[in-house]
């Protein structure tokens, strides 16, 4: 008898890939998960848990882990790629011989490739040329999903079929999937917020108050949207789950990897010590450098990203950098309502302002 259940493939054995695999299995799909570590493969299949990335949380027994890429991808209707950005291209190329144009390919990776400043869905598009490509992003802490805490996410794609199929595959009583057609904006939001989570962790370690945290998050949102809109994204995307939603959870939760790196740095640990203690990839560290370079090339004002770069890579003390940022010229709150240039022009109207 033929098994009519949809087949889902998940590439990646980390915390989020494992959580997505378990959701799809909860919804009745046949789920195969590809990963490299033989010991972890055996543990998922035998004990139905991932002790390295999601300790103490049960995985749906229907999830079958394997190191055989061809077998995992065989007959899969939906393919979720949950691989760190540094290895994303390599894994996509490894999978390419067994991918088909009819498959729906969805990136869950919140990062940027250094070569060409490419987002993960752009890599999928370039490498495959397939029509059904999407991005899954939002305020999604994997450990909370694994505990079946009520969670919402965004599937972003130009393709209506991709959006609909992902909503059907993952939507359930504890995981709600909203749709967007701004793939670029949703993906940029997921990558950019990691920068500011590091800054939020530093601020917490330095004992800064709630006013400071609120200021940091709202100015981070302004900076994220300024950068993304300059590159072609829709500014309204950033008032949704993939913008302010993801920013809030990543800057507030001690479960956030980037927040934890920032907190360690705020306690005067070196970057190497902070990343080593984490034991997982914190995408924000690499993203800071890439975004800072891109912003300079495109002449986009990014004071928080610039300041964080100085702390991470040039050894400037975090408290000193915060003081320097507070001394910068005051500008517009919401630039899509009142531009920075209009604020600066208005200062010329003040008594005693110099003629220019």
UniProtKB/Swiss-Prot annotation:
**Keyword list, A-Z:** Cytoplasm, Lipid biosynthesis, Lipid metabolism, NAD, NADP, Nucleotide-binding, Oxidoreductase, Phospholipid biosynthesis, Phospholipid metabolism
State a GO cellular component annotated for this protein. Answer: cytosol
Q: Which reaction does it catalyse?
A: sn-glycerol 3-phosphate + NAD(+) = dihydroxyacetone phosphate + NADH + H(+); sn-glycerol 3-phosphate + NADP(+) = dihydroxyacetone phosphate + NADPH + H(+)
Q: Subcellular localization, per the record?
A: Cytoplasm
* Pfam hit, one: NAD_Gly3P_dh_C
Q: Which PANTHER family match?
A: GLYCEROL-3-PHOSPHATE DEHYDROGENASE, GLYCEROL-3-PHOSPHATE DEHYDROGENASE [NAD(+)] 2, CHLOROPLASTIC
In the record, the note on similarity to other proteins reads: Belongs to the NAD-dependent glycerol-3-phosphate dehydrogenase family.
Function of the protein: Catalyzes the reduction of the glycolytic intermediate dihydroxyacetone phosphate (DHAP) to sn-glycerol 3-phosphate (G3P), the key precursor for phospholipid synthesis.
Q: Which protein, by its recorded name, is this? A: Glycerol-3-phosphate dehydrogenase [NAD(P)+]
Can you name the source organism? Chromohalobacter salexigens (strain ATCC BAA-138 / DSM 3043 / CIP 106854 / NCIMB 13768 / 1H11)
What phylogenetic lineage does the species belong to?
A: Bacteria, Pseudomonadati, Pseudomonadota, Gammaproteobacteria, Oceanospirillales
